[in-house]
Amino acid sequence: MKYFKNIIFWNKLHPDEQKKILSRPILKENNFIKKTVKEIIENVRLFGNSALKKYTFLFDKQDINTFQVSKEKISSSSFYLSKVLKDSISVAQKNITCFHKAQIPSKIDVETEVGVRCEQIYLPLNSIGIYIPGGTAPLFSTVLMLAIPAKISGCKKIILCSPPPISNEVLYAAHICGIHDIYQVGGAQAIAALALGTETVPKVDKIFGPGNAYVTEAKLQVSSIFNGTEIDMLAGPSELLIIADNTANPDFIAADLLSQAEHGVSSQVILLTPCFELAEKVVLSINKQLNNLSRLSEILKTLKNSSVIIVKNLSECIEISNMYAPEHLIIQTQSPREVLNYISNASSIFLGLWSPESAGDYASGTNHVLPTYGKSITNSSLGLCDFQKRVLVQELTAKGLMKLSNTIEILSSAEKLQAHKNAVKIRVDFLKGKI
């Protein structure tokens, strides 16, 4: 059966049509969601745990009296998982730890002038919240992606929230990462609890993690409150762009496109290639592989937003890719690193035949929390720096201040900031014995 046959010739399209092809599925503003989330946040602020209990029963159909998961339940989660799964989680943990430890920044300590010492130091965030969605497929891999850099950074308090009942996979992943403050609360109410605090759930300084439209809206709203909780990013639907030439494997490409298409209705996958024969083989392979996949309805909805695009050459592939700024970029060409040199916008890049996007999702070591919706033009993938803050330190000796004093006084006078000038002058006068 032919589920997909959307091959497009880029240079036969009008510029407006080209723009439309690269447009993401529209994320419609939903006033009902905005209003509902605002009400949930306000009720959590006013009524704390009572509001959490009410919403947990309403949305999750769970009657929860104790939100915090006991340490016994967390540690016993190991007994419910197979050795094969636990060993695989350990491999992923090792690789993610290795890559993120390599991101530990070095302190900067320089003397810009004689007697003028400037430093940049890195301090961990005091408290962070991790949100892990529930559902039929618990995202325990995201626990690793968030908890491991938080621990390496030295965050003092790490709180995890997830809708009840929390899966043993999520509890186990949290346990091996050293997270023991876990609360069975989900949705917008969990984000509100982390941002505001309740009798049980502690308030945190920054919230990390994906979620549905309600969770995303809640993150947006709590981060907009004056002096409110910070957030990692507003994650959008998953997206993948592949650049391929005639050396690529069409079955591999089809499998990669489908791996992202199964994320859901608003996801988008695109293949760019100068090779029509390859494009035809990819389309055939997509239709063949679809017969063996379980999430067929989700994939078919995604494929309606997706395209196989024929272009003139690899240079045009690169130009279009940089314009699109994908979340995930796979380069399957004869010389992928040569193409990499010309890529300016992408969140996570996968080179060559043997680098499926799934590797980055789970176990290569890189983080899978990534900017979407073209945000890779200015934003970066999640990393150690998101769990830290840069602090600047300066120390001047008397000699150093004397040397800079004239410069500072002239500059502050030019900006008509007399008090700034005086803060230097009063010290200089003291050193000259005028006070």
Swiss-Prot record:
Gene Ontology BP terms: L-histidine biosynthetic process
GO cellular component, one term: cytosol
Keyword Amino-acid biosynthesis found: yes
Note accompanying the cofactor annotation: Binds 1 zinc ion per subunit.
UniProt keyword terms in alphabetical order: Amino-acid biosynthesis, Histidine biosynthesis, Metal-binding, NAD, Oxidoreductase, Zinc
Any Pfam family the entry gives: Histidinol_dh
EC number, UniProt record: 1.1.1.23
Entry binding sites for substrate: 238, 260, 263, 328, 361, 415, 420
Cofactor(s) listed: Zn(2+)
Record pathway: Amino-acid biosynthesis; L-histidine biosynthesis; L-histidine from 5-phospho-alpha-D-ribose 1-diphosphate: step 9/9
Subunit structure: Homodimer.
Family: Belongs to the histidinol dehydrogenase family.
Identification of the protein by name: Histidinol dehydrogenase
